[in-house]
Amino acid sequence: LNFIGMRNFSFSFNGAWIKSKVQFKEGGNNIDRPMQGQSPYLINTGLFYNNPDKGWNAAVLYNRIGKRIIGVGNRYGSSSEGDARNIPNSYEMPRNSIDLSASKKFGKLEIKATVRDLLAERYYFKQFEDVTVNGQARTIEEVTRSYKPGRSYNLAIAYSF
């Protein structure tokens, strides 16, 4: 990023917009859906600082994934018979993650500190079912599982012989 006066800094961006589809034969119990485990988008960015003259190195990384199927649902029965039962797909919901790292060299000695998952946002897993209540269509959203993994810290000291 020297061109904007940020000497020793660099920036990276990687993003993907993905459309996947698993198709089934008509008349079967399965409903067309996105591929299991495939996020519809991914975002990875990073801001890096590297000053070899002073021995400093640092990074801030941001990652996000889109809502993705982690468990494929199923449909039983036939809607023409009026007794169809739908078990919805289970989704991992989008979440933001920021990682930090910094290191400093003192000759042959290097000290490095990292913080992973600085935001420590909860993981949410949900199911969505479309229903009709009193003639009105609506979606029921249920959290089937959630947990907060927390952030992790690391301090490393290395010496080169």
What does each model-found stretch correspond to?
Residues K21-N29, Y76-D83, V133-R138:
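Flexible, solvent-exposed coil segments and beta strand-coil junctions
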